[in-house]
A protein has these predicted regions:
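Internal helical hairpin/lid segments
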Residues: 213-281
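Short basic, glycine-rich beta-strand/loop surfaces that mediate nucleic-acid
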Residues: 84-86, 249-258, 295-306, 310
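Structured C-terminal subdomain patch of bacterial secreted/periplasmic proteins
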Residues: 275-276, 287-325
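Glycine-rich phosphate-binding loops that contact phosphosugars or nucleotide phosphates
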Residues: 31, 36-167, 209, 257-286
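Aromatic-enriched
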Residues: 174, 282-286, 303
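Glycine-rich, charge-decorated loop segments at or immediately adjacent to ligand/cofactor-binding or catalytic sites
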Residues: 120-130, 244-247, 290-299
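Active-site phosphate/pyrophosphate-binding segments
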Residues: 2-37, 138-141, 154-235, 325-327
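Structural motif
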Residues: 21-26, 72-79, 241-244
């Protein structure tokens, strides 16, 4: 595969998975000590990657989970937040301004702070009551985040008696690395062709729903806009017909991200309409990917898998547009 280091990728996956035992001990301790609610506090991509976690929790649990934008959270006087809140953060660099400020704010309020970070010895590590370090660069960051966050959310639900199959699912997830490599391999040619075709396209729509809505938001803003400087709109499939439909034309690039949860009919509705109007509809679907988990668990892995697939498109866009993904 073009510009892909399999050994580096597999190491990111295995390092993230290796956090599970220590994470479980901390999560169990926090659960049995008791906490009022869970706050997932992010900015940019980390905010986006928290959205699927909230979606999953809402389908499985009555546990109060709040996903908030870090800068806004500090200013808004959120009445759900208190010293009894468990606050989770993620930062690749370890010095993200808004995250550092939010952790400081939570600490001053007496709340418990737990962070995932890719670089040790950074402010996020130093400020958080608990921190877990697992190195990743931007291209494989979401895999690292999701594998950590799955342990957090599903362990909490397991302790609440709302996800009793925790050990079974995670024993299967432990062997996921080669399946993610295969997902990239099977997406390679499509991604190469799509990137070549869209090398000069100046506007995209990215559509998602359910557990992959956060990835649609992330891909539009953090990859196509931030890293490729392409005007892009992320659209929830359920909202497409309430405005965006009017901008769909024959040459409109529409990238559909399909997960495997109950919201697939929303995506089908967009596809069935948009494909009659636009000749530029592309589909990335996690259902096409073989995974080592039981069918009923696949929906929870869909945001991780869609991110893994999209990395191939990003890599080829970088080449075709001669525009680095580090910008």
């Amino acid at each position: 595969m073009f510009n892909f280091n399999e050994d580096r990728f597999v190491k990111v996956i295995e390092d993230a998975l290796s956090l599970r035992v220590d994470l479980e001990k901390i999560i169990d301790d926090l659960y049995y000590k008791g906490f009022g609610n869970l706050f997932l506090i992010g900015v940019g991509g980390t905010y986006a990657h928290f959205l699927p976690i909230k979606y999953m929790s809402e389908t499985l649990s009555t546990m109060p989970v709040h996903v908030v934008q870090a800068a806004e959270f500090i200013l808004q006087n959120n009445k759900h937040f208190s010293k009894d809140s468990l606050c989770v953060f993620c930062s690749r660099s370890g010095d993200t301004k808004e995250i550092v400020e939010a952790i400081t704010f939570c600490n001053k309020s007496g709340a418990t702070t737990l962070s995932f970070v890719c670089n040790s010895g950074t402010p996020v590590c130093e400020l958080s009551k608990y921190h877990f370090v697992s190195f990743a660069e931007d291209d494989h960051l979401a895999e690292c985040i999701y594998l950590g966050m799955y342990s957090v959310i599903f362990r909490l639900l397991k302790n609440r008696g709302e996800f009793v199959e925790y050990e079974k699912m995670f024993d299967q997830i432990n062997s996921i690395a080669p399946f993610l490599v295969k997902a990239k391999e099977q997406t390679e040619e499509m991604s190469k062709s799509l990137a070549k075709h869209h090398r000069n396209t100046d506007y995209h729509m990215v559509v998602g729903s359910g557990a992959v809505w956060g990835e649609a938001y992330d891909y539009a803003m953090c990859i196509l806009e931030e890293m490729q400087w392409i005007k892009t709109k992320s659209i929830h499939a359920g909202e497409y017909f309430h405005g965006t439909i009017e901008l769909t034309e024959e040459d409109t690039s529409i990238i559909l991200l399909y997960g495997e949860d109950a919201t697939r009919p929303l995506m089908d509705r967009v596809y069935n309409f948009a494909s009659k109007i636009s000749k530029e509809v592309a589909v990335f679907d996690t259902r096409t990917v073989e995974l080592p988990v039981d069918e009923k668990y696949r929906q929870y892995l869909s945001p991780l898998v869609i991110y893994t697939m999209l990395e191939r498109f990003s890599c080829h866009l970088e080449k075709e547009r001669n525009h680095p993904l580090t910008t």
